[in-house]
Amino acid sequence: MIRIAPLGAVPALLREFGIDPEPLLRAHGIKDTETFKDQEATMPFAMGGRLLKTCAERTLCPYFGLLVGQRADSSVLGSVGLLLRNAPDVITALNELVTNLALHDRGATCFLDISGNDAFLGYEVYVHGVAGTDQVSDLAMAVGWNIMRTLCGPTWLPSEVRLRHEHPLDIEPYRRYFNAPLKFNAEHSSLVFPASWLPQPTQL
């Protein structure tokens, strides 16, 4: 199961693409758009992946998941987001995220690795055979970017963004949003940034 809150922008985005969200949502087992207003509502992980995949196909927007994630921040994580916002420094906040994300996301794991001067904040889907995992990963990386900017302030930027999926035909939406070098077909989806940010006090 996953929280539905990170997908909260789906209905509005569909409308912006000229698509009535109600029939599409019902086809995926979601009663109506009101469901997205319940911050504590959940859905099966596979359902979320299928929904994002269908949205990308219907809108002819292969980076639909990225757009959804751009409109989400730590608040969509519920109690986990609250832990992040109350953390004294960046590494404490990220450790809270890594440790507690499984409370709301039973289909993927979040990790924080440090190698030399680099830190890697990543997201890995571990449920096999789920449709739309590329969309899910794009969404997660966009939310992660927003979380890091919230924790570190507007001067934070990743030194590289790594995405597991194939190189898209149009990388401009990714370049414009992440404002960092991009690496596709990566082993894991992750935000790479200087580890010197980790002991910094949070900017909340």
Residue ranges and their predicted role:
Residues M1-L121, V143, P168:
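N-terminal low-complexity or simple alpha-helical regulatory segments
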Residues V90-L204:
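Alpha-helical bundle regulatory/interaction domains
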